[in-house]
């Protein structure tokens, strides 16, 4: 009898390391308690999406997103569900930039944000930039539903490539809808109420495609050579100040929305210049439509 153990199969030194794609969806819900203080009623982390409370007081809760692993890599499917209850204000930030990397998984990496903001509530979603590394394919999807009197501050910053390298491919989709304020049901001359129509209207539906596979992306009609692109959306009931008017400046555009709301878009050579250009209009955004952010948030 031959009792010698079988030799292990030979492994090529050039073989790609195996990695299981990651599928993770975290959840975060904030509600006011009976005393009017905001409390986190659900906080579900899912590696690598790790929300952590870091501050806030009164009706405000501040949460930072902590990355529990590198990436995302190709094929990773990540997401975050948010609910902000009536009267609460949730501020979401991240501790560092997200770097989308190439990998051996099938399809692009994805990150999906879904949020519902209740009556008289506010969501400030202000993460650090997303860097799309060379060779990466990344897709970002955001769907937000606002109550009729809810407020929103949403920032999105994209950096194409790490330092000294070209960027990868990116697709983004941003959809923000507003629930109509409840009112009396319409009636006909006969006094019978017709079937109710849709009670939700679009505020902003926007898609963006960037990367070497997009024809003319570096031309003057799109990026004009810029490596950083970003936007800030502020929406909610006006505070009685003068309406915001459309304006176009040096690589910055401000567009009022029928919401009311304001969308600011900017291009820049790097992340720092992009943030400065977006923040240059922070006074308009803060003063006209949204509560100031709490100190230390």
From Swiss-Prot:
Residues 1-18 have a biased composition (Low complexity). The keyword Chaperone applies. The keyword Ribonucleoprotein does not apply. Keywords: Chaperone, Cytoplasm, Nickel insertion. Required for maturation of urease via the functional incorporation of the urease nickel metallocenter. UreD, UreF and UreG form a complex that acts as a GTP-hydrolysis-dependent molecular chaperone, activating the urease apoprotein by helping to assemble the nickel containing metallocenter of UreC. The UreE protein probably delivers the nickel. This is Urease accessory protein UreD. It comes from Parafrankia sp. (strain EAN1pec).
């Amino acid at each position: 009898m031959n009792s010698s153990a079988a030799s292990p199969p030979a492994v090529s030194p050039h073989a790609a390391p195996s990695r299981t794609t990651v599928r993770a969806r975290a959840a975060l819900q904030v509600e006011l308690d009976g005393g009017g203080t905001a409390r986190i009623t659900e906080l579900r982390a899912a590696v690598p999406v790790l929300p952590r409370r870091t501050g806030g007081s009164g009706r405000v809760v501040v949460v930072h997103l902590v990355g529990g692993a590198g990436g995302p890599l190709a094929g990773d499917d990540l997401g975050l569900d948010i609910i902000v209850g009536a009267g609460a204000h949730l501020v979401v930030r991240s501790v560092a930039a997200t770097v989308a990397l190439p990998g051996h998984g099938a399809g692009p990496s994805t990150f999906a944000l879904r949020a519902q903001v209740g009556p008289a509530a506010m969501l400030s979603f202000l993460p650090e930039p997303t860097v799309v590394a060379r060779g990466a394919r990344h897709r970002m999807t955001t769907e937000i539903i606002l109550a009729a009197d809810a407020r929103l501050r949403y920032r999105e910053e994209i950096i194409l490539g790490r330092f000294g390298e070209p960027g990868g491919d990116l697709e983004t989709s941003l959809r923000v809808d507003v629930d109509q304020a409840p009112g009396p049901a319409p009636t006909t001359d006969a006094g019978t109420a017709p079937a109710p129509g849709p009670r939700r209207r679009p505020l902003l539906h926007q898609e963006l495609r960037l990367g070497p596979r997009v024809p003319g992306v570096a031309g003057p009609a799109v990026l004009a050579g810029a490596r950083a692109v970003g936007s800030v959306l502020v929406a909610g009931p006006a505070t009685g100040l003068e309406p915001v008017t459309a304006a176009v400046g040096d690589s910055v555009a401000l567009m009022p929305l029928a919401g009311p709301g304001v969308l600011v878009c900017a291009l820049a050579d790097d992340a720092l210049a992009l943030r400065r250009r977006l923040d240059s209009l922070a006074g308009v955004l803060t003063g006209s439509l949204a509560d100031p952010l709490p100190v230390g948030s």
